């Protein structure tokens, strides 16, 4: 089994250091959010094409990449555990585009983007868990949220296991309770 760690937007693989200290190292996928989803996705496909038995551990936007990768490379993927992943898109991005019109990231992650529209249509073919973070609140969102994405967006896919944790969007990668949940799910693939 190959654990593949994919970080969230504007982060690095170091965001998984605590989780990796408990689960073990794997393949770190690093990307630059400014490059655009499609360019990063192609680079990730190339990096993973010679691997097999992949289990993704991904945070936020990293989970969207994992979903698209699993859909495009189903024979080499075993499943995934994602953290705080907004499978319905990040609603705040649709508004932020007006203030940041040149941001590729904002164009990629809004619910109306092609990336998210396609993510909503993907039928999950592998065991998949999203750890839904329910603590935190951003005043820029009218729905309950974890400080970055809405809880409803994290629950968007009904064809995966959803596990709620009392963490915000950033604390999730540092939580002992989350590490235990991730470890339990990853061990099922061993």
Q: Model-flagged regions — what are they?
A:
Residues 3-7, 14, 23-127, 138-139, ...:
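Serine-dependent carboxylesterase/thioesterase catalytic core
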Residues 11, 123-190:
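C-terminal catalytic-base region of ester-bond hydrolases, centering on the histidine
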